[in-house]
Amino acid sequence: MPKLSKRITGLLAKVEDRVYQPLEAIQLVKENATAKFDETIEAHVRLGIDPKYTDQQLRTTVALPQGTGQSVRIAVISRGEKLAEAKTAGAELAGDDDLVESIGKGQMDFDLLIATPDMMPKVAKLGRVLGPRGLMPNPKAGTVTTDLAAAIKEFKAGKLEFRADRAGIVHVRFGKASFSADALLENLKTLQETIDRNKPSGAKGRYWKSLYITSTMGPSVEVDVTALQDLEEDA
């Protein structure tokens, strides 16, 4: 087992072996974000679902009210006047067959891919390169649409797509260490409400098993899910 650095050992010593109240947990994670860059704050949610069953899968989007603090490079696959609409709305890349061909060759200089429905038969052929990276456009995620301007605006403003992995765990970034504790709490509350609102129909037993939050380089802190659910929406 690799030896922990003095910095990590010191940070771990600050985290007690208990479940923290939401705001208290966020304040501790912020305090432990001591790297020389603005660390990303992440949530890791273990749910009582088995995604190998279609009625226990979770894939949706959340619009974080305080944004993510990160810029998102968006690529759009469409044709005709829609390409100009995409560029005007702020897409970094926009193309038709040429962009499909470039992606097929492994050129993936973007964080999010949006496509219009008419281009999906061609985009579907890119499943081998897009699928493993979680970049395949999907109507449920809002990344297959004819309203490109609205979609680009939402994702630039902090809308995120997330899904439960094969183990039923959701990993989502919800801000930066430079955010205020209240801003992070507002984002985390919105994430919790979104996960509850999109509970899979086949989920059985206890839905929320655990919620941990952490910064990029810091230790994780367990959050009291019930206390988070009980917070007022304008907490």
Curated annotation (Swiss-Prot):
Cysteines paired by S-S bonds:
none
Q: InterPro entries, per this entry?
A: Ribosom_uL1_bac-type (IPR005878), Ribosomal_uL1 (IPR002143), Ribosomal_uL1-like (IPR023674), Ribosomal_uL1/biogenesis (IPR028364), Ribosomal_uL1_3-a/b-sand (IPR016095), Ribosomal_uL1_CS (IPR023673)
Signal peptide positions (record) = none
Q: Does the keyword NADP apply?
A: no
Biological process annotations from GO: regulation of translation; translation
Q: Which PROSITE patterns match?
A: RIBOSOMAL_L1
Question: What is the role of this chain?
Answer: Binds directly to 23S rRNA. The L1 stalk is quite mobile in the ribosome, and is involved in E site tRNA release.
This chain's protein is named Large ribosomal subunit protein uL1
